[in-house]
Amino acid sequence: YVLTTIDFFVLCFMCILTHLSESLSEKQKRGFFLAYLMIAGISVLEVITVVVDGLPSGYRWLNIVSNYLGFGLSPAVSVCLVYVLDRKSALRRKIRIAVCCELAYLMFLLISIPYGMAFSVSVDNIYSRGPHFYIYVIMYFGAILYLSISTIVTAREFQNRSRMLIYPLILFVMVETVIQVALPELHVTWLCVTLLSVLYFIYCNEMWNQLDALTGLLNQNSYLNQTQKIKYNSGVLVVFDVDDFKQVNDCHGHVKGDLCLAGIAECIKKAYADSGYCYHLICCLIF
């Protein structure tokens, strides 16, 4: 109960912080809200399974439903966190595939309940792991791996210097999951997942705050902070200035101009991202 109370306090605080954020898009807020609500809901379901296990058989249905939803929704938390990585409103194909996999997994769990494949609840209302409990473990680790790879790819795309911090987070959540599987009486998984979601929120915000919203390149503030640390005895600074760009805005409008600038930035990133960092300043593009 104490761990669940801590979970709720932290998750409520994060929901308020997400709601008040002026830097997150509506899509990103929605993704974080869904993740926090799922973590809170699964934490409650875990408490319910502990409380009702072994009670009179009239509570058996509640034990089954709580275990089903807890096992079924666990991988969806990672999918929600992947959803917030992309600022675009449309769902990418990979996320749609992940959602379909989650729905298929939920259907499989539902169909397998009478056979006790992943878990079973006896007529005496006693929970036990099924012979194919490993399916849940595979889905859970698969979801974590999906989140990890998506975050690493996004951080590399955005040239985030802190992307190495992703690996300790991955190691942390995997170690606690192994401990939970080996020692099921501990019930520490969702407290650790709550902590992970907070750290992930901080990491993502730091990554996005370094970006220029229009071009996806590192922004001017990031450039100024970085140049203060550089020793000017090595390296090359390449500056790109788009000729007559004002005419594009004047003749075709600022919307078309922004699209042009974003396209140019994408070309520069493809050409130079492997060799150095790309920035967008107010007046020019810099590699």
Mark where each language-model region is.
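Alpha-helical transmembrane segments in multipass membrane proteins, preferentially the mid-helix core
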Residues: 13-18, 80-84, 137-158
